[in-house]
Amino acid sequence: VLSGSDLEPGLYHYSPTEHALDILLPSLDKKEVSSIWMSQRWFRKSSIILIMTAVYRRTTDKYGEKGLPFPFIEAGHIGQNIYLLAQSLGIGCCAIGQFKEKQLCKLLDINPFEEYPIYYIALGN
Protein backbone atom coordinates (compact mmCIF):
# COMPACT_ATOMS: atom_id res chain seq x y z
CA VAL A 1 0.00 0.00 0.00
CA LEU A 2 1.57 3.27 -1.14
CA SER A 3 -1.14 5.85 -0.44
CA GLY A 4 -4.81 6.77 -0.48
CA SER A 5 -6.20 3.69 1.20
CA ASP A 6 -8.07 2.75 4.35
CA LEU A 7 -4.89 0.83 5.16
CA GLU A 8 -1.77 2.53 6.40
CA PRO A 9 1.04 2.61 3.82
CA GLY A 10 3.23 -0.45 4.16
CA LEU A 11 3.94 -3.95 2.93
CA TYR A 12 1.22 -6.49 3.68
CA HIS A 13 0.91 -10.26 3.25
CA TYR A 14 -2.45 -11.88 2.57
CA SER A 15 -3.02 -15.03 4.60
CA PRO A 16 -5.46 -17.22 2.64
CA THR A 17 -6.00 -19.59 5.57
CA GLU A 18 -7.07 -16.74 7.87
CA HIS A 19 -8.44 -14.46 5.12
CA ALA A 20 -6.52 -11.60 6.71
CA LEU A 21 -3.75 -9.12 5.99
CA ASP A 22 -0.60 -9.24 8.08
CA ILE A 23 1.68 -6.21 8.02
CA LEU A 24 5.27 -7.07 7.14
CA LEU A 25 6.73 -3.56 6.94
CA PRO A 26 4.89 -0.66 8.57
CA SER A 27 6.37 1.86 6.18
CA LEU A 28 7.91 1.83 2.74
CA ASP A 29 10.63 3.98 1.24
CA LYS A 30 8.81 5.13 -1.91
CA LYS A 31 12.12 5.86 -3.69
CA GLU A 32 13.37 2.32 -3.01
CA VAL A 33 10.09 0.79 -4.13
CA SER A 34 10.03 3.06 -7.19
CA SER A 35 13.50 1.89 -8.19
CA ILE A 36 12.30 -1.74 -8.22
CA TRP A 37 9.92 -0.84 -11.04
CA MET A 38 12.47 1.52 -12.61
CA SER A 39 10.36 4.63 -11.90
CA GLN A 40 7.88 3.72 -14.63
CA ARG A 41 5.22 6.39 -15.24
CA TRP A 42 2.29 4.36 -13.85
CA PHE A 43 4.05 4.06 -10.48
CA ARG A 44 3.58 7.75 -9.66
CA LYS A 45 -0.22 7.38 -9.75
CA SER A 46 -0.49 3.99 -8.04
CA SER A 47 -2.05 3.66 -4.62
CA ILE A 48 -1.58 -0.08 -4.29
CA ILE A 49 0.69 -2.61 -5.95
CA LEU A 50 -0.41 -6.24 -5.69
CA ILE A 51 2.41 -8.75 -5.89
CA MET A 52 1.66 -12.45 -6.35
CA THR A 53 4.36 -14.97 -5.57
CA ALA A 54 4.65 -18.68 -6.26
CA VAL A 55 6.05 -21.40 -4.03
CA TYR A 56 6.62 -24.02 -6.71
CA ARG A 57 6.94 -26.94 -4.28
CA ARG A 58 3.29 -26.51 -3.38
CA THR A 59 2.31 -27.68 -6.84
CA THR A 60 5.27 -29.81 -7.89
CA ASP A 61 5.15 -31.96 -4.73
CA LYS A 62 1.60 -32.89 -5.64
CA TYR A 63 1.67 -32.88 -9.46
CA GLY A 64 5.33 -33.29 -10.37
CA GLU A 65 6.62 -31.26 -13.32
CA LYS A 66 3.04 -30.83 -14.57
CA GLY A 67 2.54 -28.49 -11.60
CA LEU A 68 5.14 -25.94 -12.74
CA PRO A 69 2.76 -23.79 -14.85
CA PHE A 70 -0.14 -23.92 -12.36
CA PRO A 71 0.93 -20.84 -10.31
CA PHE A 72 1.12 -18.79 -13.53
CA ILE A 73 -2.30 -19.98 -14.67
CA GLU A 74 -3.86 -19.20 -11.29
CA ALA A 75 -2.15 -15.79 -11.14
CA GLY A 76 -3.62 -15.02 -14.57
CA HIS A 77 -7.11 -15.93 -13.35
CA ILE A 78 -6.70 -13.74 -10.27
CA GLY A 79 -5.31 -10.90 -12.38
CA GLN A 80 -8.26 -11.04 -14.77
CA ASN A 81 -10.71 -10.88 -11.88
CA ILE A 82 -8.85 -7.90 -10.41
CA TYR A 83 -9.08 -6.13 -13.79
CA LEU A 84 -12.84 -6.78 -13.92
CA LEU A 85 -13.35 -5.56 -10.36
CA ALA A 86 -11.20 -2.46 -10.92
CA GLN A 87 -13.18 -1.64 -14.08
CA SER A 88 -16.49 -1.93 -12.25
CA LEU A 89 -15.21 0.37 -9.46
CA GLY A 90 -13.67 2.89 -11.86
CA ILE A 91 -10.15 2.27 -10.58
CA GLY A 92 -7.12 2.29 -12.86
CA CYS A 93 -5.43 -1.09 -13.19
CA CYS A 94 -2.22 -2.09 -14.96
CA ALA A 95 -0.28 -5.35 -14.98
CA ILE A 96 3.45 -4.77 -14.61
CA GLY A 97 6.10 -6.53 -16.65
CA GLN A 98 9.38 -4.76 -15.98
CA PHE A 99 11.03 -4.86 -12.55
CA LYS A 100 14.27 -5.65 -10.75
CA GLU A 101 13.93 -9.21 -9.45
CA LYS A 102 16.73 -9.15 -6.86
CA GLN A 103 15.52 -5.90 -5.27
CA LEU A 104 11.93 -7.12 -5.12
CA CYS A 105 12.89 -10.44 -3.50
CA LYS A 106 14.96 -8.51 -0.96
CA LEU A 107 12.05 -6.18 -0.17
CA LEU A 108 9.70 -9.15 0.25
CA ASP A 109 12.35 -11.03 2.26
CA ILE A 110 11.92 -14.18 0.19
CA ASN A 111 14.41 -16.72 -1.11
CA PRO A 112 14.01 -16.65 -4.92
CA PHE A 113 14.97 -20.34 -5.11
CA GLU A 114 11.92 -21.24 -3.00
CA GLU A 115 9.40 -18.48 -3.69
CA TYR A 116 9.31 -16.12 -6.63
CA PRO A 117 7.24 -13.06 -7.57
CA ILE A 118 5.28 -13.88 -10.73
CA TYR A 119 2.54 -11.26 -11.22
CA TYR A 120 2.21 -7.59 -10.34
CA ILE A 121 -0.72 -5.24 -10.68
CA ALA A 122 -0.75 -1.51 -9.96
CA LEU A 123 -4.05 0.02 -8.84
CA GLY A 124 -4.91 3.69 -8.61
CA ASN A 125 -6.14 6.64 -10.62
Spans of model-derived segments:
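Acidic, surface-exposed loops and disordered segments
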Residues: 1-125
